[in-house]
């Protein structure tokens, strides 16, 4: 009986560790992406330049704010 209980406890601990590790890594990844978005100012300038526009600094910052706001809103909608 003690052996079955020990094995069951090990399995439960392994599953709990797996799910907690997954949750923690997902949370850290989201935080990292919110702090350092993969789309930076240079990428926005390049994208707008490829569309035939010469963006001003105000336009670049506006696009970045819109992207960050959309990401934050989608993150809060998922919760």
UniProtKB/Swiss-Prot annotation:
This is UPF0154 protein llmg_1186. It is a single-pass membrane protein. GO terms for cellular component: plasma membrane. The chain crosses the membrane at residues 4-24. Belongs to the UPF0154 family. Keywords: Cell membrane, Membrane, Transmembrane, Transmembrane helix. The keyword Transmembrane applies. HAMAP family: UPF0154. InterPro entries: UPF0154. It holds the Pfam family UPF0154. It comes from the Bacteria. It is found in: Cell membrane. Its main location: membrane.
